[in-house]
């Protein structure tokens, strides 16, 4: 079966080896905001597009991947 692993913002960050603090430094998004996005995806869904775009660029993923769709493009090595 070819199931894709669905990743959260926290998982993308961990996959890249970034702490919340490091991602904050890279994006200009406060660490508290990143914590809130990781804690409750509703907060992320209510974020400004420009904020989500900064996170996506830093994580080297498409903006759509930040919103966790099963059909989102994932790196091949995490597809199962």
Can you annotate each of these PLM segments?
Residues 9, 23-24, 34-37, 66:
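Conserved hydrophobic/aromatic packing and binding residues within compact polymer-binding modules
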Residues 19, 30-33, 48, 62:
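Short coil turns linking two alpha-helices in DNA-binding domains
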Residues 49-65:
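DNA major-groove recognition helix of helix-turn-helix/homeodomain DNA-binding modules
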Residues 1-16:
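A short, Lys/Arg-rich alpha-helix, primarily the initiator
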Residues 29-45:
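Recognition helix of helix-turn-helix/homeodomain-like DNA-binding domains
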Residues 57, 65-80:
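Short, charged recognition helix plus adjacent turn
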Residues 10, 21, 53:
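Residues within the helices of the helix-turn-helix
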